[in-house]
């Protein structure tokens, strides 16, 4: 429209459509703009609608969210509402929450789960095992303290921790995803990663 409005309800689009206003120049399909528009529509979805559609995507990918309790599933879904550009991305972004065992991306594992990182991840595992409060803030502070004690940068611990928990180099906030997974599950996933290293 002439007022530069970028998102309109379908009824208003129909009402405001003006064929003489359509330019004759060659049209181009802007994928980046489509991604942005999808992102905005996802963010605008009511929570129940987003959950229904996201669960459908997880099910289509062979992931059974029903095997987890509703609070866990809701917390996992909340981590992706402001991040994904397309509902088709849901399973790839948070699917790791619904696997009993981490499915490792080979490239991520080769980069992060190295023999050099094993002592760092083992020390972080012990720090996390000793936490009385297992929330995002406590996890972040514990990681920073562990990195300082080992005289390494935070990223030396962040990437192995992320790959151990998710199998991937990308995904939701590390500290928030670990909070959702819970202490026992994070320690289990760390142990599995350490055994591979």
Residue ranges: model-predicted function:
Residues 109-165, 170:
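C-terminal accessory/binding modules appended to enzymatic or scaffolding proteins
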Residues 1-104, 166-197:
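Catalytic adenosine-cofactor/nucleotide-binding cores of aminoacyl-tRNA synthetases and other
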């Amino acid at each position: 429209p002439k007022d530069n409005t970028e998102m309109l309800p379908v009824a208003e689009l129909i009402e405001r459509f003006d064929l003489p206003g359509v330019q004759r120049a060659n049209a181009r399909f802007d994928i980046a703009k489509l991604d942005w528009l999808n992102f905005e529509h996802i963010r605008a979805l009511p929570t129940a609608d987003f959950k229904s559609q996201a669960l459908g995507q997880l099910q289509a990918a062979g992931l059974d969210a029903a095997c987890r309790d509703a609070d866990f599933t809701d917390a996992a879904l909340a981590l992706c509402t402001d991040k994904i550009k397309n509902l088709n991305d849901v399973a790839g972004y948070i699917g790791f929450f619904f696997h009993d065992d981490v499915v490792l991306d080979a490239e991520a594992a080769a980069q992060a789960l190295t023999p050099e990182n094993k002592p760092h991840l083992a020390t972080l595992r012990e720090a996390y095992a000793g936490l009385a409060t297992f929330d995002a803030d406590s996890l972040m502070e514990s990681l920073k303290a562990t990195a300082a004690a080992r005289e390494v940068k935070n990223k030396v611990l962040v990437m192995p921790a992320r790959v151990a928990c998710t199998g991937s180099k990308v995904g939701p906030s590390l500290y928030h995803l670990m909070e959702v997974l819970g202490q026992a599950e994070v320690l289990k996933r760390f142990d599995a990663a350490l055994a591979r290293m």
